[in-house]
Amino acid sequence: MNLKLISCEIFYREMCAAVAHSPHRVDITFLPKGLHDLPPGQMPVKMQEAIDAVDGTYDAILLGYGLCNNGLAGVRARNCPLILPRAHDCITLFLGGRDRYREYFDTHPGTYFLTSGWLERGETSGDLAELSVQAQLGMNLTLQEMVEQYGEDNAEYLYETLCQGTRNYSHFAWIPMGVEPPGMEQTARQKAGERGWSFETVPGDMTLIRKLVNGGWNEKEFLTVPPGSAVKAAYDGSIVAGIQ
């Protein structure tokens, strides 16, 4: 098959490694991680633009995304089917499936996950940084910048309320996928040490990523959206569904 993969850059190393061994021809377009930080409704617009830019020579378009806080809701297939994993977010793909992610999530509250993509590409930059919810709410300001704008008392309250997005976390889970350069785990450990958080290595699983680029998409793990139909959120455990 001739496939097109549109993926979040958070999967850069993993998708490249999987595509290198795919039995199919797979052309890749990576989109910036910062799409997740846009105001509600804007990520689907950017995703649709990327899909509409694909020419009609492909048998299917693969989406290297989870539902991502409804970031794919409303996205429509045009000339060929869309294939996407049944996943709320990217951690499902890094851990190989929904069941393993749910098991870990339920037993390890307050966990912040790290992979090579987050360490290398986790910061939103460029035009997307200016458009992000964080920038529009002032969540990207330092405490000193807030003091200068709002006064000391107001600044401390706003900083605690808006800018401490990790205050409910206390644990780093490093997910090695077998594609990282030497020393990256040590970088992750250093980040945990800087925050005084606990640290754990949770082995990653490339199974779902490989299935995405290898074809043979089973209905339990993947949604196939035929031309003319769109993606919608599902609330019956299937996570995503198709709609005319």
Which ranges hold each PLM region?
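N-terminal basic/disordered segments at the start of proteins
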Residues: 1-22
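A short beta-strand-loop structural module common to alpha/beta enzyme folds
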Residues: 25-41, 201-203
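Glycine-rich, highly charged phosphate/nucleotide-binding loops
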Residues: 41-53
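N-terminal glycine-rich phosphate/adenylate-binding segment common to multiple enzyme folds
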Residues: 50-101
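Extended, charge-rich low-complexity interaction segments
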Residues: 54-73, 113-129, 223-244
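Long, charge-dense
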Residues: 80-128
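Extended, basic/helix-rich recognition subdomains
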Residues: 152-244
